[in-house]
């Protein structure tokens, strides 16, 4: 890494944010399934995902779950905010804030060791860590934005 700065990319999943008390994708799905179950009068289930699969004849997906619970993009943002944005109490506890790992990655980027970071995360902890380092990252969060992105020069 030291002899070939910038030649590496990172791929991050939800594990990087778990210690910040951000739920994993699986856990978010479980909570969304629970919301659907409660609305249908089901109070408890040993396996939330299996209940959904049995009831809907398909595996749970974010799109399907959100389509069941909310109808507008604004409602979607409000629903998902609970999972990723800290409440006042969570702020006091230091939860849902960039971790040492997020900050270390931001420093690696600032120093030029890493130029490309791919993440499957919905949270913005990595972007916040970049802001702490004075970096404005180019974030591509949906497919159409790829064609509008600034090309990476090697």
Across the structure, where does each feature detected by a protein language model lie?
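Conserved catalytic-core helix/loop/strand module for nucleotide-ribose chemistry
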Residues: 1-154
């Amino acid at each position: 890494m030291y002899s070939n700065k910038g030649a590496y990319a990172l791929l991050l999943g939800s594990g990087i944010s778990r210690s910040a008390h951000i739920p994993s994708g699986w856990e978010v799905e479980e909570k969304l399934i629970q919301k659907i179950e409660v609305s249908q009068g089901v109070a408890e289930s040993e396996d939330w995902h299996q209940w959904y699969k049995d009831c809907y004849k398909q595996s749970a997906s974010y799109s399907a779950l959100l389509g069941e619970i909310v109808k507008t993009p604004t409602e979607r943002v409000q629903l998902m905010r609970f999972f990723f944005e800290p409440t006042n109490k969570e702020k006091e506890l230091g939860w849902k804030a960039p971790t040492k790992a997020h900050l270390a990655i931001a420093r690696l980027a600032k120093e030029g060791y890493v130029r490309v970071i791919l993440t499957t995360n919905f949270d913005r902890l990595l972007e916040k860590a970049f802001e702490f380092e004075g970096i404005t990252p180019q974030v591509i969060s949906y497919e159409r934005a790829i064609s509008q992105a600034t090309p990476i020069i090697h």
